[in-house]
């Protein structure tokens, strides 16, 4: 394979090049005036046609990546804006949550890992706080960090070569999940998992059961334009097996005992946070889909 490197026809927008210190004093300048002299983002040049599978006809010049440079820079800036942490601190294994108690648990576990002298080196927190095994009063520093300024604060347990874990508190709703994953996708992470809870729909379920989806009834509509609801989202066998084995490790159960704790079936996602108020309509749809 012969690879040629040439000067790009796309200029790098000034907002993607300047950091906060370099941009000091520019707040008083009209953005339109800056755009006269410096390249600015052209949204018509930014898109997800490759990743969304819209470029399906044969073409001579094949893309080298799912996301081009402009799309990547666009998302890197958004990640920094939403999460309050440097993009370089993001790790390849991602967790999402919308409960602060999971954030607290992750921080406590992360600090324990730092003290154990293992492969994790630092814990980076939204608001510019970074601690390591030698940091005094690390928990207090983290609690006092200005993480509340950011819509989706991130917490990075950093290991070499990005092999650590990142937790992002994405807030409530499927639109938030789409927002952050649209941007995280340019980092090409190994995997991401949502850590939260769902409402059980069957009397055989009890609080604390694990639920592993093998199908989805997608009533959230956030992906309908690029992945219509009639196109199924197939479960990935390797992920399903890994999660099942993890549940067995955590509970210590196996066989029939594990089946009582780990339920598999159809999971409903919805953009109506108050679907219970229209339960008559919802119940019929849930029953038809065999949702759990």
Located regions from the model:
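Accessory terminal and edge-of-domain segments that mediate assembly/interaction
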Residues: 1-191, 199-292
């Amino acid at each position: 394979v012969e690879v040629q490197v040439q000067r790009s026809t796309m200029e790098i927008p000034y907002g993607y090049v300047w950091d906060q210190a370099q941009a000091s004093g520019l707040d008083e300048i009209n953005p339109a005036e800056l755009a006269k002299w410096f390249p600015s983002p052209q949204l018509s040049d930014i898109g997800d046609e490759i990743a969304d599978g819209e470029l399906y006809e044969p073409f001579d010049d094949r893309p080298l990546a799912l996301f081009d440079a402009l799309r990547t820079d666009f998302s890197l800036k958004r990640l920094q804006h939403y999460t309050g942490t440097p993009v370089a601190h993001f790790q390849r294994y991602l967790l999402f949550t919308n409960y602060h108690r999971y954030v607290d648990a992750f921080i406590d576990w992360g600090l324990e890992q730092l003290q154990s002298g293992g492969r994790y080196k630092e814990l980076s927190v939204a608001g510019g706080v970074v601690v390591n095994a030698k940091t005094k009063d690390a928990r207090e520093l983290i609690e006092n960090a200005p993480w509340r300024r950011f819509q989706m604060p991130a917490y990075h347990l950093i290991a070499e070569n990005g092999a650590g874990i990142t937790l992002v508190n994405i807030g409530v709703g499927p639109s938030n999940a789409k927002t952050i994953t649209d941007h995280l996708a340019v980092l090409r992470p190994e995997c991401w998992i949502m850590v939260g809870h769902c409402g059980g729909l069957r009397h055989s379920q009890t609080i604390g059961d694990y639920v592993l989806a093998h199908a989805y009834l997608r009533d959230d509509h956030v992906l309908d334009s690029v992945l219509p609801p009639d196109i199924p989202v197939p479960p990935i066998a390797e992920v399903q097996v890994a999660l099942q084995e993890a549940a067995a490790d955590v509970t210590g159960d196996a066989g029939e005992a594990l089946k009582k704790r780990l339920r598999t079936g159809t999971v409903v996602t919805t953009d109506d946070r108050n679907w219970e108020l229209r339960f008559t309509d919802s119940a019929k749809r849930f029953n038809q889909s065999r949702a759990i």
